[in-house]
Structures are given as C-alpha cells and as structure tokens.
Amino acid sequence: MRSDEVKKGIDRVAHRALLKALGVTDDEMDKPFIGVANAYNTIVPGHMTLDKLTQAVKEGVYAAGGVPFEFGIIGICDGIAMGHEGMCFSLPSRELVADTIEAMVEAHRFDGLVVVASCDKIIPGMLMAMLRLNIPAIAVTGGPMPYERVGGEKVSIKDAFEAAGMYKAGKLDDAGLKLYEDYCAPYCGSCQGLYTANSMQILTETLGLSLPYCSTSPCPSSRKLRIAKQSGKRVVELVMQNIKPLDFVNERSFENAITMDMLVGGSTNTVLHLPAIAKEAGIRLSLDLFDEISRRTPHIVSIDPASKEMVVDLDESGGVPMLIKKARKYFHDEMTVSGKTLYEIAEMAVLRGRDIIASPDNPLHKEGGIAILKGNLAENGAVIKAAAVSEDMMRFEGTAKVYDSEKEALNAILDGKVEEGDVVVIRYMGPKGAPGMPEMLLPTAAISGLGLQKVALITDGRFSGATRGPCIGHVSPEAAVGGNIALVEDGDKISIDIPARKLEVKLSDEELAERRAKWKPKEKELKGYLAKYAKLVRGAEEGAALL
C-alpha cells in the first residue's frame, strides 16, 4: 500500500508516533489509509452540511476496514461572490482546490481518496485532483437545494437575482422583495436549478465518478447520507482491488458527459470545466467536439432557469439513470466507480413522481442545450445556453453598447440606458483581463427583471448557470490579448445566429485592422494569487486551465 511509506519499517518510528498522536492504533497501521477531502464551511449554503456527509463517509470507510483522515478544502459561494471583486477569485479557486488536494494526498501517502463537495468550482477542482493523482477515489456531491414557493410559484435563487430588476421596474414592492429574499434559498444544498453546481454534480455521476443518484438526491435527504456511507465503503473496495479513476474514465466517458450536458441543457461553465478535467487525464476536449455532440443530441429536459422545474423534480423523474435509460443510444456503455456500467445503472432507474423527461424521439429541441458560436467577434469560439433562449431570439441583430466593466454595464442597464434592440458588450472580463473570468449574472438578471425581451449580452467573461436569454460568453480571443471584442464600438451592428453558429460584428477586415492599429492593451495592477494566475492562465477555449 502507498501508506506503507509512512507507517512501515524501523525508520518510520517517528511517523508512527505522530500517527498514534491522532489516535491510530497498532492494528489500524495495517489498514488502508483513506484521505477525505471535505469542503465544509459555514459561508456556502451548498457546503454547510458537508460535515454530516463527511461523517457518513468516514463511518463507511471504518465499516469496510479502512482508516479515514479528514482534511479541509476551500470553497467559494459564487452567489455571495457575485457582482464585486470577489468574483475574480471564483474560477481561479478551481486550481487551488486541485493543487491543495494533490499536496495533501501526496504528502501523506493516502491509499485512497473521497472528495466531498457541492458547488461550482469546488467539484471541478476535486475531479481534476482525482484524475491527476489517479489513486482509488470516489466523489460525493452534496445534492440540490429543495425549493419553496412565492405567490404559488416555485422560486429559486435566480428569482432573487432578478427581483432587483423587477423592483426597479416597479413590478415588486418592498414586501414582495422581502418575500424573494426570505424564500429563494430556503435550505442547504446547491442552488435549485440547473446552474453550474448541479450541472457539474450530474456530469460527475455521468463520468462514473460518483454513485448512482448521488447528483440529484436532495441535500437534506437521508438517501444522501446513505450514499455517502456507501461511498466510504466503496473506496476501500477500490483500494483492495486497485481500481483507479483512469482505469475506467476515458475519452468515451467525457463524450458521455458532454452528451448529458446537451440532453439537460446544463450551465455554460461546463464548457470550461470538462476540458480542464479531461486535461488531467491527458485528453483534449475541443469546442468543436462540444458543438458536434450538441448538433446530434436532442434536448429532452427543461430545468430552471429554462423552466420552473427544479433539480429535485428531475430526481423524482429518475435522475441520471432515467436520462440514460431514455436516451441510451446516445451514450457509450462505460464502466463507473460503482462497478456497474452506465447501461446497467440505467436499468435501475425508478420514476417516483412526475415525468419531466421527454422522449428523444419527441424532444424539446432537436439539438443540445449548449451551442458554440464562431465568427469575427469570436474567432476561437464563444458559448451560449441555447436551451434558455426564446425561439424569436435565436437570430438577432442589434446595436452595440460597449462597457469595460460589469459595474459600468449594470449601472447603465438599471438607469434605463439599455433599450430593446441593443447588444450589451462587456469586455476585459476574460481569464487574463479581469482576471479570473468573472460571471456576469447581475447584468443579465437586471435585463430579465426589467422585462427587456429584445436585448442580447456578449462578454469575454462567464455567466452563471442561472443566466437565461441571449447571453453569449467565453468570447475568445478575449479583449485583454487583442481579440476583436476589444475593437467593438458603440453603435456597431452585431449579428447573432444560433442555428448557423455565427457571431459577427458588421465590420470589414479593413475596418477591424484600422481599429487594431490604434488599440492599446489595458494595464492592470495585480498582486498575490491573481497576479500569478493572470500570467499562467490559458484561454477560455482551453478551459481556462493553467499552463
């Protein structure tokens, strides 16, 4: 066992003494040592009960004959970090999560690993670490937050973000605003809709790195505790059988994850995270592959922000196993950490409530929920959640209103300076430019809350999974490195054609060249982690991974 390097032999007397200081007994020195990476904290709603899940994991490890060692991992709440400088740290924290898990596991020579997390960047960071380390490992994801109702309607955190615009437009009074504040995040768990956290939990299960139903089992449920305990038992079995993630996660597994992403209309952030995770396995996922799979995969379930259905409703409909069962022909039958293949898991699917999953033969949309756009405004690509765009906005031409910061754009929107027919352009928000590629949820929520139906938004930054409407992100090359988005001016005409996958500014090559000759990069004073990150980060089309 790997852990023998810290517990066996005469020259490890001091090591054993330190382990005994923790309460490790002589007989436990012969058992597998299992690291349990716990992202519990009391600032992230999706993480505030991970201590209980981690306890269940450790009980499972003990029951199966292993010795668990828990260690802490950071976790940022994207919702609380939204709309201020803190959002610049969200995406970069993914790499910190991966690196710190790697450091802890390698330093202490754990035989196996369980990662416990719920939210946006923490899950991808943990999966990156699992594949990088390639020791027996399993993921336990915290599960979705249940919803409450306001005015008889289901509400989610998306509604709270949009409430500010509704209030500004006179659609809500003070009492109504308070209701949204009090009931849009009523429980523990990852925010209710198919935003980034729940999208990544579903893709983790599809990749085969968590047990069946782990992703959609609600945060407060006893089923979640049982899955956590089973995961603790399973990791010990994986150690005994020497089954490592890269023994079953391969290119076809990632194709399955992209397919699932398209079937459900997941967050556009998955287009950043999956390539970064795959890179740790030596696999390259191009934007072209995402678009190729999107074109051949139907969209069969509509979940908030695209509808009023929530992830707990998907769980009642059978979760990931039922999605695979209904859309079996679109998936490769790959092995999973459970010891069962995807097809075998699909046969376990149980419908417990309403069925919100359409048949692939009669889908909601013939193509997948995410589209990759290219053109002179995004030569390396841009991303849009097509599943959350109304039919009449699939093709749109509008007038550019250009802003070099989120705050500037948000103020203009709330002050009524953005009108129907406009295309809001927010630039210098990319991986290097911001840096950290912050999410632009507040401007998009303001547009929705104000009831603006014919306004698009384009950025080299990102969007929250809660964003809906014609919002195009990840524009690459970004403004900070001289991408054409840096050359757009107020009044330019911008054309969006989602079916044709086109994103164009109506300027000739000569006009762009003339503007480029006058362009100068913006200098930004950076310090600490973000200064290092800005130097090392790659473009959005490469998952904003570090060199």
Swiss-Prot record:
Catalytic activity annotation: (2R)-2,3-dihydroxy-3-methylbutanoate = 3-methyl-2-oxobutanoate + H2O; (2R,3R)-2,3-dihydroxy-3-methylpentanoate = (S)-3-methyl-2-oxopentanoate + H2O
Residue numbers binding Mg(2+): 78, 120-121, 439
Binding site for [2Fe-2S] cluster: 119, 191
InterPro entries the UniProt entry points to: Dihydro-acid_dehy_C, DihydroxyA_deHydtase, DiOHA_6PGluconate_deHydtase_CS, ILV_EDD_C, ILV_EDD_N, IlvD/EDD_N
HAMAP family attached to this UniProt entry: IlvD
PANTHER family: D-XYLONATE DEHYDRATASE (PTHR43661), D-XYLONATE DEHYDRATASE YAGF-RELATED (PTHR43661:SF3)
Protein name according to UniProt: Dihydroxy-acid dehydratase
Organism the protein comes from: Archaeoglobus fulgidus (strain ATCC 49558 / DSM 4304 / JCM 9628 / NBRC 100126 / VC-16)
